């Protein structure tokens, strides 16, 4: 939550909108509200951009039907709208790293972006420092501001106030950290998502993420979107 205020999670995909709200007590979380609606005739992620009014209307309906009272929202954006890299850098102090970030020289030297830096929202985090080898690993996540705005405009027009934005795979990772039985060991954890628009694997090991797209043929995509397939295949 943000400053102890309630926050509702909003997940918008081409074919479905989901809302979820948790309640916490003594470090334990309970799913208190869950609501969703399917979007008819949504083909791919471009539907969200080209038919935004439909998504606004559906989201407004879900808020009402799900009896969501808070207006604060945590919004997920798709992996396909983000550039995610773990970059290896010479060891720097926090002050040196912040100075390099503030001058944009760090990203210009280590990350090749297709557009100007000011067209991206950038998040970074030091994953680990290796003083013996004088190296450090840094997580770099960049999302186009235009892509983010498409989602935030839908959320705002439906009456919510987006206070948190996160890439979907990392939102899932953060939720997974609440599962102490899974995160207490050093064994790698894999998160796999298959769908019409998002297909990737995220492997977590020692707090370092590795993410890779999974290629699906057009035939496989049609199979995933076919509501009449054998339930065993779901």
Where in this protein do the model-derived segments appear?
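Hydrophobic/aromatic-enriched cytosolic interaction surfaces used to assemble or bind macromolecules
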Residues: 1-234
């Amino acid at each position: 939550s943000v400053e102890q205020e309630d926050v509702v999670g909003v997940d918008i995909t081409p074919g479905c909108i989901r809302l979820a709200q948790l309640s916490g007590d003594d470090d334990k979380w309970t799913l208190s509200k869950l609501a969703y609606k399917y979007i008819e005739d949504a083909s791919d992620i471009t539907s969200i951009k080209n038919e935004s009014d439909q998504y606004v209307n559906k989201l407004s309906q879900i808020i009402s039907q799900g009896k969501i009272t808070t207006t604060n929202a945590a919004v997920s954006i798709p992996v396909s709208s983000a550039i995610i890299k773990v970059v290896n850098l010479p060891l720097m102090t926090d002050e040196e790293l912040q100075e390099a970030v503030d001058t944009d020289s760090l990203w210009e030297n280590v990350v090749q972006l297709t557009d100007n830096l000011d067209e991206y929202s950038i998040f970074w985090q030091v994953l680990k420092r290796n003083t013996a080898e004088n190296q450090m690993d840094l997580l770099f996540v960049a999302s186009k501001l235009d892509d983010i705005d498409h989602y935030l405009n839908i959320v705002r027009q439906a009456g919510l106030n987006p206070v948190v934005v996160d890439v979907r795979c990392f939102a899932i990772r953060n939720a997974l950290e609440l599962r102490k039985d899974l995160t207490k060991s050093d064994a790698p954890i894999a998160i796999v998502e298959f769908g019409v628009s998002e297909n990737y694997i995220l492997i977590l090991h020692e707090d370092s993420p590795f993410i890779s797209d999974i290629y699906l043929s057009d035939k496989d995509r049609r199979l995933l979107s076919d509501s009449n397939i054998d339930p065993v295949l779901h």
